Amino acid sequence: MTISGLLERWAGQHPETGFLTYCENGAWKTRSYGETLKGVREVAEGYGRRFGMTPREENAAIILANSPEWIESYLAQTGAGAAVVPIDPKLHNDEVEYILKDAEVRVVTTDTRHLKMMMTIAKRLPCLRGVVVVGGVINEGQKIDGRVDVVGYESLRIAGGGAWYDAHHAKPEDIASIIYTSGTTGKPKGAMLRHSNFVKDLEGAFEVFGAEVGPSDSFFVVLPLFHAFSFSANFIASMMKGASMCFCQSLRTVGQDIHDLKPTVICGVPLLAEKLHAKIESGLQKSRLARFLLKIGLRGPVMHMVKMKLGGRLRFFITGGAPCPRPVMECFRRLHVRFLEGYGLTECSPIVSVCPPEVLKIGTIGPAIAGIEVRLADKNESGVGEIQVKGPIVMQGYFHNPDATAEAFEDDGSGGLWFRTGDLGSMDEDGFITIRGRKKALIVNREGKNIYPEEVENTIAKAPCVADVVVIGYTQGGDPGEKVGAIVYPNEDWYRDSNGGKLPSREEIDKDLVKSVHEKCSELADYKRVRKVVVAKEPLERTSIGKVRRVAYKGTLDE
C-alpha cells in the first residue's frame, strides 16, 4: 500500500465522507475524500505536463503552512512517483537554500510570502526548474534567473486530468519523503522514507490502540505537517482509518477551534497539553459555580462542563517528543480522555513505541509497536543502554550522505542493521521503555557518574515559578569532568498572580527563582544537583514543535 493508495481506497468506498476541514475567509469548509482525490489527480496532471518530472529520479519540495494545498500537492507529487521534501516555512533563507541544494529539488511549492526568498536563492540552485505559488496574484510568465518558471498553483489544475497520475503511479518501495532532521549536531541530513515505511509504521501503531479509531473520528491538526510526527499521526493515520482532519487556524485560536470543531483525537507535544491544562485550571478557579460544585464533592458536572469546552467528543490525546507532567495526564484522564505518550524519530517514520490505552504506566513511553524490534545496546549496571531499532519502519538512509548513513547503523553480525537512535533508555519486564536522555546530552562528573539532564529538568519544572528550563554540563577551569548547570526562565504569570496582580521586580524574581531551583534539586541525589543557575532574560529558544533547543546553550556556562 502507498500513501496515495490510502486516499484512493477511501475515496472509492466512501467518496462523500469529509476528509479535510479548514478555515477560509472566516468560514469553516470541508472537502470530501472524493473531492480531494479529484483535486490530487488534476494537480498531478499539471505538475507532470508543466515540469515533466522523472518519477523516482527527481525531488520536489513543499514550503507551506498546514492547508488543503499542502495535502493536495504532496499527494499529487508522491502519488505520481516523486519524492517530496517538506520544509519548515519558518527556516531562514540560508537553511532553506541548503536543503533545496542538498536534495537537488526540481520544483518548489510555496506561498507568496516565500516567493521573494525563492527569487533570491534560486540563482544558487542549479537543479531548480520551477516555483509553484499558492494564493495571491503573480506574473505567470516570469522566470527567475532566466530559467526557473514561476507558476500559480491553480493554473496547474487541469480539469478532468489524471493520466499522468495513473501512468506514473507510486509503488510501496518508492521514496515518498526526504525529511531533513533539525541539524542540532551539524548540518541537517535528509532521511529517505518509503511509502511502505510510513504505512507499516501506522499499521504497527494502530495494533496498540487503533481498533477504536474509525471513520467517525476527527484528528485536530495543530502541529505542522512538515514534522514527521504530525505527518504520520494526523495525515496518514486519518487516511488509514477513513477519518477526517481539521486544521486549527493558529496557535492563538487553539482553544476556540477545539470547541468549534469538536475533534476526537489530538496529536501534539506536551507543551500543547500543558497549555490546555493551564487554561482548564484557570477557568475552574474563575468559575464560582465550578468552585462550589467541587467544594461539595460534585466533580462529575464540573468535568462535563470542562469536556464540553473541549468540544465534547475528545477521546484521545497523544503526545511525543518530551515527557508530559503527571498532573496534566491525570487531568485529561479525569475527563475520560485517554492520554497516551509515545516515542519516535524521523528516521523511524517516526513512531517507535506508544503506551496502550488500557495500561497505565506513567513515565514510560510504552512497548515497541507491532512489527519491529527494539533493543538496548551497551547497557550499564543500571540497565540503561542506547535504544536501537530494526524493522520495516526504518529509513533507507540519508540522501547523498553515505558516511552519515553508515554511522547511523550498527551491524549485529548476522547481516541485520540496527538504527542507532542516540537516545538512552531502560526497559521493564513487560517491554515498556523509559527514556533516560540523549546520549550526547549526558553529563559525566569528575567521579565518572552519569547525570541525565532530562531527569534534573523534570524535577526543576515541577516548581510553578519556572516556565522554561534547560540543564547542561559545564566545565570550570581545568577541573576534570562536568558540573550540572541550569538556565531557567520565570513563569511571569505565576509571579503576577502570587503578588496580587503585580509583577515583582526583576531582582526579586531572579533571587526567588534561583532559590526555588535549588530547593527542588534537594529532592535529587547530591551528585545530580545543580551547581550553577542562570536566569535567562528571554524565553528559551525552542524548535518548531516546542522542544527547548539544547544545542543553543551548550558551552554557555563554561568558566
Positions of PLM-derived features:
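Conserved pre-ATP/AMP-binding loop-to-beta segment of ANL
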Residues: P15-G18, V148-V151, I158-Y180, K187, ...
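Conserved AMP-binding/adenylate-forming core of the ANL superfamily
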Residues: F19-T54, E58-S67, I71-L75, H92-E97, ...
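Conserved AMP-binding A3 loop
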Residues: T30-G34, A176-L202
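Structural core segment of the AMP-binding/adenylate-forming
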Residues: G79-S155, E482
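Conserved ATP-dependent adenylate/AMP-binding module captured primarily in the ANL superfamily
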Residues: P89-R124, D201-F220, L251-V265
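Conserved AMP-binding/adenylation subdomain of ANL enzymes
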Residues: V199-S218, L225-M305, R313, R338
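Conserved ATP-binding/catalytic segment of the ANL
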Residues: R375, S382-N445, P453, K462, ...
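Conserved C-terminal "lid"/linker of ANL adenylate-forming enzymes
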Residues: D468-G473, K515-E559
